[in-house]
Amino acid sequence: MLALRCGPRLLGLLSGPRSAPLLLSATRTCSDGGARGANSSSGNPLVYLDVGADGQPLGRVVLELKADVVPKTAENFRALCTGEKGFGYKGSTFHRVIPAFMCQAGDFTNHNGTGGRSIYGSRFPDENFTLKHVGPGVLSMANAGPNTNGSQFFICTIKTDWLDGKHVVFGHVKEGMDVVKKIESFGSKSGKTSKKIVITDCGQLS
């Protein structure tokens, strides 16, 4: 069971095969959207997630992946967006959304927080903790403890510096933070969403 500590409360979040604990300790092709190798001005890949809620489109989130800092983690996410390995994020859900904290997704096998896999196998090690959870829009890996990264990820909606050194930050929202806020609006303190929030399409931008 994935344990997410919010202040004195412990919120259960399921992640990983065998319901391994995904620890978010808190104190308070998918289709290809264009040519391969699309980059931001920094030379890092840009990917997109098109998101809908109960069948209604919410919009597009564009993410810059920090391949210059965490290349292996960034490549995992990029390939899961394009679906080039035969599996990926398209059709999966934001299964856990906690307002004033984060929006979690990436379980494309079980769709409830108990599954997912990386392009390197079931799990891969923490690459580094160079990047920090500095504020809204930070893109970070969910995990079940040290060196258990798979496909689940979360987008922060506040600064979450208590997660530094525990979760690998590998990107940030470049465009579409308004869409992230819409996703957040369907969340709850327990993490259960009031609508089914689906990644309807995803890929790499040209």
Swiss-Prot record:
Q: Name one GO molecular function term.
A: peptidyl-prolyl cis-trans isomerase activity
Gene Ontology cellular-component terms for this entry are:
mitochondrial matrix; mitochondrial permeability transition pore complex; mitochondrion
Task: State its location(s).
Answer: Mitochondrion matrix
Domain PPIase cyclophilin-type per the UniProt entry, residue ranges: 48-204
Q: What happens when the gene is disrupted?
A: Mice are developmentally normal and show no apparent anomalies. Mitochondria do not undergo cyclosporin A-sensitive mitochondrial permeability transtition. Cells show resistance to necrotic cell death induced by reactive oxygen species and Ca(2+) overload, and animals show a high level of resistance to ischaemia/reperfusion-induced cardiac injury. Mice show a dramatic reduction in brain infarct size after acute middle cerebral artery occlusion and reperfusion.
Question: Which family does the record claim for this protein?
Answer: Belongs to the cyclophilin-type PPIase family.
Describe activity control: Binds cyclosporin A (CsA). Is displaced by CsA from the mPTP leading to a lower open probability of the mPTP.
Q: Which residues carry this modification: N6-succinyllysine?
A: 66, 85, 174, 189
What InterPro entries has UniProt attached to this entry? Cyclophilin-like_dom_sf, Cyclophilin-type_PPIase_CS, Cyclophilin-type_PPIase_dom
Q: Transit peptide extent?
A: 1-29
PROSITE patterns attached here?
Answer: CSA_PPIASE_1, CSA_PPIASE_2
Q: How does it assemble?
A: Associates with the mitochondrial membrane ATP synthase F(1)F(0) ATP synthase; the association is increased by inorganic phosphate (Pi) and decreased by cyclosporin A (CsA). Interacts with ATP5F1B; ATP5PD and ATP5PO. Interacts with SLC25A3; the interaction is impaired by CsA. Interacts with BCL2; the interaction is impaired by CsA. Interacts with TP53; the association implicates preferentially tetrameric TP53, is induced by oxidative stress and is impaired by CsA. Interacts with C1QBP. Interacts with MCUR1.
Q: Which domain of life is it from?
A: Eukaryota
Q: How is it modified after translation?
A: Acetylated at Lys-166; deacetylated at Lys-166 by SIRT3.
**UniProt KW Magnesium keyword:** no
Task: Please report a single Pfam family linked to this protein.
Answer: Pro_isomerase
Q: Name one GO biological process term.
A: apoptotic process
Q: What is its EC number?
A: 5.2.1.8
What the protein does comes down to: PPIase that catalyzes the cis-trans isomerization of proline imidic peptide bonds in oligopeptides and may therefore assist protein folding. Involved in regulation of the mitochondrial permeability transition pore (mPTP). It is proposed that its association with the mPTP is masking a binding site for inhibiting inorganic phosphate (Pi) and promotes the open probability of the mPTP leading to apoptosis or necrosis; the requirement of the PPIase activity for this function is debated. In cooperation with mitochondrial p53/TP53 is involved in activating oxidative stress-induced necrosis.
- PTM annotation (S-nitrosocysteine): residues: 202
The name this protein goes by in its record: Peptidyl-prolyl cis-trans isomerase F, mitochondrial
Reaction catalyzed? [protein]-peptidylproline (omega=180) = [protein]-peptidylproline (omega=0)
N6-acetyllysine, modified sites: 66, 166
Q: Which UniProt keywords apply?
A: Acetylation, Apoptosis, Isomerase, Mitochondrion, Necrosis, Rotamase, S-nitrosylation, Transit peptide
